[in-house]
From Swiss-Prot:
Outcome recorded upon mutating P503A: Temperature-sensitive
Protein's name in the database: Protein translocation protein SEC63
Gene Ontology biological process terms, A to Z: cytosol to endoplasmic reticulum transport; post-translational protein targeting to endoplasmic reticulum membrane; post-translational protein targeting to membrane, translocation; SRP-dependent cotranslational protein targeting to membrane
Record's miscellaneous remark: Present with 17700 molecules/cell in log phase SD medium.
Cellular component terms (Gene Ontology): endoplasmic reticulum; mitochondrion; nuclear inner membrane; rough endoplasmic reticulum membrane; Sec62/Sec63 complex; translocon complex
Record-linked CDD domains: DnaJ
Subcellular location(s) of the protein: Endoplasmic reticulum membrane; Nucleus membrane; Nucleus inner membrane
Protein species of origin: Saccharomyces cerevisiae (strain ATCC 204508 / S288c)
PROSITE patterns linked: DNAJ_1, DNAJ_2
Topology within the bilayer: Multi-pass membrane protein
Repeat positions for Sequence: 461-471, 493-503
Amino acid sequence: MPTNYEYDEASETWPSFILTGLLMVVGPMTLLQIYQIFFGANAEDGNSGKSKEFNEEVFKNLNEEYTSDEIKQFRRKFDKNSNKKSKIWSRRNIIIIVGWILVAILLQRINSNDAIKDAATKLFDPYEILGISTSASDRDIKSAYRKLSVKFHPDKLAKGLTPDEKSVMEETYVQITKAYESLTDELVRQNYLKYGHPDGPQSTSHGIALPRFLVDGSASPLLVVCYVALLGLILPYFVSRWWARTQSYTKKGIHNVTASNFVSNLVNYKPSEIVTTDLILHWLSFAHEFKQFFPDLQPTDFEKLLQDHINRRDSGKLNNAKFRIVAKCHSLLHGLLDIACGFRNLDIALGAINTFKCIVQAVPLTPNCQILQLPNVDKEHFITKTGDIHTLGKLFTLEDAKIGEVLGIKDQAKLNETLRVASHIPNLKIIKADFLVPGENQVTPSSTPYISLKVLVRSAKQPLIPTSLIPEENLTEPQDFESQRDPFAMMSKQPLVPYSFAPFFPTKRRGSWCCLVSSQKDGKILQTPIIIEKLSYKNLNDDKDFFDKRIKMDLTKHEKFDINDWEIGTIKIPLGQPAPETVGDFFFRVIVKSTDYFTTDLDITMNMKVRDSPAVEQVEVYSEEDDEYSTDDDETESDDESDASDYTDIDTDTEAEDDESPE
């Protein structure tokens, strides 16, 4: 081992090393960014054609109109997707741009480095030296060698060459000779194949891929400081930060202290206690995340801010704090929902979902919440004039003018916008509900079934479509191999749920549906909640405006009504446990609730009929050996029968004689 190391004075190594490390970072980031630019929007929206465009535009424009300037300012600050400028000058884009600039500089430096070119020319390639291909025959090799020897042999060089030119020609001839021997002489060829050179092992040098001034010069202490900072400070800092975050937060993204508070509340929860929105908000006010955001505020302050938001009250100087904690409630309530399902507590789970609806729409949980979530509604006027109207379905039994009177909306333009929002809030109608087992016609003991729901997403303005009008083929599950292998794949092909109308929520909200399954026997939740984020809202488009429940019509004769134009959505819920081991009927409660709207949710009872598998008929397989044995058996049986026939005849005759004797 040499005691002295050579430094990379000619910059032969370190540019390539840095270039490789840089490309390992910049390359994948660039590909990911290109994918998001060209395919990210389509993957996020998920819809196509009118089934997407109308719903997105309706709520986009109305959200923009009814969102306050304070919330818009908050969104520009915290919502990265709300600012186009932030998309262009995002941190990732800046890193990519700077990275490719550095790549270009390094490539230019490498290409203009003569030392790298000289190192490349030192590589011995006999085929290149002789000017032949790697598939050349021995005859071609000898022919090329003769031609080059005539040109570069020292005895045949021109007399007018300078000493330098003559030296180059002689060196070239030596290389030609070595190349020829590397391909024809067996010993020299072995050296070339083993060491890469016909002369055998070449001298090697050990160096440091850094310039001398960084190690031996005045910059040496700086390099040591950089190494110490990288290995002793920066790397441990990021690793410890990652580890602390991993240990401090649950899989649902909530702090362990918050999760511990939720668990403690559920442990101490009394079944006789009524679950209300106020109770859930009280639990939320102790979230550790809120304390991290605003250390100077207390849980009572957080609870007051949440109450201000739900009742649409101004919080003065604490408005920004209110927006911040309200925006965080999304992950907190999903974490509470998951913990409640772990405790199998259906009341708390439903309370968490209803509370989130209240927070999204900024409406308290009352019998009138379906109406109060609409824009432009005069709350005091409506409560005094409401009568028995509490739902959107009941509201759309009135004429538009009467609806304006009930809601206290006098301006026709505002009334039209209110009706537009009301008619595009999704309602679910169950068409078909089954327990299915892939590849089976029925649920068998200990099998793995799942719940398949066929639903019609409709508007409260539209009349109910009789199930008898829906063709059976529109409800039938596909039976191909891929569907049997992964029955949930078809759900991923449905479009994403559009953005919700939520002008009071601090961030843009894309709606979803939460599915809960509980036992009808004891009311306990059986598994974790299933969140549905893909479901077609095509039936809410403008082309269905003619379909108004206030207009009497015969659907079978209406010229614009075509059942095939109506989208049937599919919701599949995997069960977290196998079917019971015994045969019988088992009843389950299935709940599908919107997380963003007060609307018509699904709450149905399903019967799981567990039956034994039908008996399989055994098919006898023909065998020549069995046939031989059966022939012998037949002969034996015939012999036995012939022997037994004598006794039979005697018995018969005797009986005949006995019968005749009395006569």
